[in-house]
UniProtKB/Swiss-Prot annotation:
Gene3D superfamilies according to UniProt: Ribosomal RNA adenine dimethylase-like, domain 2, Vaccinia Virus protein VP39
Pfam family name, one: RrnaAD
Record gene name: rsmA
Name assigned to this protein: Ribosomal RNA small subunit methyltransferase A
Protein family (similarity comment): Belongs to the class I-like SAM-binding methyltransferase superfamily. rRNA adenine N(6)-methyltransferase family. RsmA subfamily.
Listed GO CC annotations: cytosol
Taxonomic source organism: Brucella anthropi (strain ATCC 49188 / DSM 6882 / CCUG 24695 / JCM 21032 / LMG 3331 / NBRC 15819 / NCTC 12168 / Alc 37) (Ochrobactrum anthropi)
Molecular function in Gene Ontology: 16S rRNA (adenine(1518)-N(6)/adenine(1519)-N(6))-dimethyltransferase activity; RNA binding
UniProt signal peptide: none
Amino acid sequence: MSIDGLPPLREVIERHDLMPKKSLGQNFLFDLNLTSKIARQAGNLQDQPVIEVGPGPGGLTRALLAQGAYVTAIERDERCLDALAEIEAHYPGRLRIISGDALEQDFSALFPDGPKPRIVANLPYNVGTQLLLNWLLVEPWPPFYSSMTLMFQREVAERIVATPDSDHYGRLGVLAGWRTVSKISFDVPPQAFTPPPKVMSSVVHIIPRENPLPCNANALGQITQAAFGQRRKMLRQSLKPVGGAELLEKTGIDGTRRAETLSVEEFVALANAYRPIK
């Protein structure tokens, strides 16, 4: 049963010869019930602006539009543009298609006025983590978006929501924990995709904090990169490239500890000590 009167996705993909490309990190979702479930995680979308990255043939796009959203979809794969144009014609004035690379997109310029958009996407696996890092480190803060509802490989999702002293805790968990509140909403099995990935996927819902701890985003990015770049080493070793001895002395943090034991607050303290040293 179609959610919108448009042809089934399998038919669309066959008609436009849209076999997923591994080089673009593509894994298409065919089940419109599942894409509708993802869209619902973003909240009430009626008349709300939404940014979608990597729509492919438009399965999630259709679910977002069916729930009343105004969607701006950014697609790098030109093969998908005709299929997306058919959806655009079905929802006049509700879908804006941008052909290009999301990593080069100025997202804050897409919605200069009106309510902040929500980002809802089944992100291409090969750029998903980098896009999230860009959105977490964006300036100014609060950011250009009001929330993010994103699909990742399960392992990446666990890194986003990880806490200190856990196996998945790392740079991504620190940056996400600093500026946002995040949770894993639900898992999606490999067989839901074409082609099926080798791992479980998860949908993560992320809400920006209005007032995160004061800290320079670039400094925190550099500190976490150094600390977790050699995560099994003591901080006095891993932080050497960023003046670790002085940072540890200023903050009173024990240099024999390892990065995965530090709280977000302790990383913020290191970053704030790092700025005057630079």
